[in-house]
Structure formats: structure tokens, C-alpha cells
Amino acid sequence: MSTILLVEDNPHIMKINSSCLSMEDYSVLEAADAAQCRYMLSNNDVDLVILDIMLPDGDGISLCREIKAKYDIPILFLSALSENDDIITALRAGGDDYLPKPYDIQVLIARVEARLRSVRKDKRYISFGRLRLDTCLLY
């Protein structure tokens, strides 16, 4: 079962997203701010972060950079900011996907599935410089 960390300061959005993702058989962790996000990441094995940009104790863009510097975890941004510049900034900061609010929950679930599929493919291989090993052949 994949573990998703939701970082969202709006309790209503958090509840809806958490419930819907749980119904899809994901393990869902919740963080209402950047500090809780850091704590959850340091104490749990997380497969995907769903990150809001506007947080009470910082911004999601800076937090994304911080996460990417320490962890190899895909980040899907959810934000009310929907201008092209906002999307470009988030993706250039290391975000792997961006979904503007409001959004259809089925689109969110489809994007989560796509991100996690890509993670599973990447984890199949180990790279050492130019050498790339298929871990399925090691067993």
C-alpha cells in the first residue's frame, strides 16, 4: 500500500482529499503546515507528497525545494494559484505535477496513480554512474 502525505491547511479540503484517497486504498498522512510535514517525512516512509503552496508557516515552493534536497519523493502541488507563472515556479522548484483548485477529485486520483506508477518504474532500477541495473534480475 502506498503512503501519501497531504500537506493542506484547509481542514475541509484535507478531509475530502484524505477520505477519497483512503477509499482508493492509500495510506494517508496529514500535515496542516510545513513543520508537521517535516516531522511526518522524517518519521514515515512516504511515497508521494500532495502539497499546497500557501501554508500558515511558510510557502510550499520553499518546502518543495527542501523536500527534494533530502528525499527522492514525487510532489504534486494543489493550489488556488492558477496563473502560468505560479505553475512554472512550482514545477521548476521540483514539483512533479500541479493541479489548480478547484479540481475534480477523480482527476486528483488519476494523477496520484500516474505519479505512483512512475515511482514504481524508477525504483526497479539502480544506477551507478553510467551503469543501470534492473533489480528484478538480482533476485
Please annotate each region the language model reported.
Residues 1-119:
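N-terminal/domain-start alpha-helical segments
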Residues 3, 113-139:
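Short, Lys/Arg-enriched segments at the junction into DNA-binding effector domains
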